[in-house]
Design a protein with these regions (language model features):
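C-terminal alpha-helical cap of glycosyltransferases
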Residues: 329-361
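N-terminal Rossmann-like NAD(P) cofactor-binding module of classical short-chain dehydrogenase/reductase
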Residues: 76
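Conserved acidic donor-binding segment of nucleotide-sugar-dependent glycosyltransferases
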Residues: 290-296, 305-310
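A charged, aromatic-enriched C-terminal amphipathic alpha-helix characteristic of glycosyltransferases
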Residues: 29, 308-341
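Charged, glycine-enriched surface loops/patches
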Residues: 90-102, 125
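Nucleotide-sugar donor-binding catalytic core of glycosyltransferases
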Residues: 1-48, 52, 56-66, 70, ...
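A short, histidine- and acid-enriched strand-loop-helix "catalytic/donor-clamping" loop
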Residues: 100-113
Length: 361
């Protein structure tokens, strides 16, 4: 079967994109995969709204042209927030493609720019919607979803299975007691500011975009910023050279999880994450395969405890690594495909299911 994978693909090999990690697992399932980068920018500057509108029109027309040429049995979209409902309908009508979307943000988060009107209006057009939070399923059904599957932020096992070599230079460059890898946000800065002020003896390393733009040189955080966003093997080196990797959950993720929930355990390193139901109970078990915090005081206590108890850290690292192996992209996509085939039959990919929800755990 032919599958058109629509996502953000970077031409810069140093920049990791999640969509790229879907290619090999889908090929292993027997799909002939063709990719389409929906974030191609045809203007040097995107400052003008007219440029944005024209660019979106070009992208939508190019996607339709690519689909008409390739005639995919399945079009698998990863976010694809700029793809218009009319484009989806045209592809369904002219190519008879089965449309799937995995949305890695909240599809209803218009308030912070993580979703668009295209997505909200397009929810009912997709044949199958994949979502990382059980809490969002009722809203998706109300929005007209035909079929919904719970699909966690599975990690790329091919990337995380690769051996990394830590040189002395790497150790000097990445070494820290506590590490955070992620984009600047006010709430994240507040948490890290508390750590700096209450635990000044710790070595804190921050990697991510927008930190230098938002943290003034007078802030206690400024000298903790090591650099911009890091990905792939570079990120794994930062994890390996730190005793504790912190994870903060955005408000839009509610009681769910995020990419770091699995990436850190998959790296065989220690994760200390903001407590959510999914992380502490559903995906891992708090105190055995994951460590969590909810308040500044609890965060300080957990940092001090685990910094001084390497054996306790190692137990959780081993348990979390084993548990994370259930959440590789290869396994989760295979479960999804098997569930679909068992439900509908291998030759019935175009038939539609009305308002049903399937769950992958």
């Amino acid at each position: 079967m032919k599958l058109l994978l629509v996502g953000y693909f970077s031409q810069d090999p140093s920049i990791y994109t999640y969509a790229t990690s879907f290619i090999h697992p889908l090929q292993k399932l027997g799909f002939e995969v063709k990719t389409f980068n929906y974030r191609t920018n045809f203007f040097l500057s995107g400052k003008f709204r007219l440029h944005t509108i024209i660019n979106q029109c070009i992208i939508n027309q190019q996607l339709l042209n690519a689909a008409l040429k390739f005639k995919p049995d399945v079009m698998f979209c990863i976010k694809a927030e700029t793809i218009q409902p009319k484009t989806l309908l045209a592809i369904k009508k002219q190519c008879s493609s089965y449309l799937v979307n995995f949305y890695p943000d909240s599809p209803f988060a218009l308030w912070n720019g993580n979703s668009t009107v295209n997505i909200v209006k397009g929810i009912a057009v997709y044949d199958h919607f994949l979502i990382w939070s059980h809490e969002l399923i009722p809203a998706l059904i109300s929005a007209g979803c035909k079929q919904i599957s719970y699909f966690p932020f599975a990690f790329d096992n091919e990337l995380f299975a690769q051996n990394i070599i830590i040189t002395e230079k790497d150790q000097r460059y990445f070494s820290s007691d506590v590490c955070f890898v992620g984009t600047w946000e006010p709430e994240r800065a507040q948490w890290l500011d508390i750590i700096c002020k209450k635990l000044p003896f710790l070595t804190l390393a921050i990697w991510g975009n927008e930190w230098f733009n938002n943290v003034p040189p007078t802030s206690v955080l400024y000298n903790k910023i090591r650099g911009n966003a890091i990905y792939g093997m570079t990120m794994r080196k930062a994890f390996a050279c730190s005793k504790i990797i912190l994870n903060f959950i955005r408000r839009q993720n509610i009681q769910a999880h995020n990419m770091r929930t699995f990436e850190v355990p998959a790296s065989k390193t220690f994760l200390l994450t903001q407590r959510t139901y999914d992380q502490a109970t559903l995906l891992f078990k708090e105190g055995e395969s994951i460590a969590c915090f909810a308040t500044p005081d609890e965060l300080m206590q957990k940092i001090i405890f685990y910094i001084n108890n390497e054996q306790e850290r190692d137990i959780i690292v081993q348990n979390s690594f084993l548990r994370a192996q259930e959440f590789t992209l290869e396994k989760q996509l295979s479960k999804l495909y098997t569930s679909f085939v068992n439900q509908k039959g291998p030759h019935d990919i175009h038939s539609k299911t009305q308002n049903s929800a399937s769950f992958i755990t």
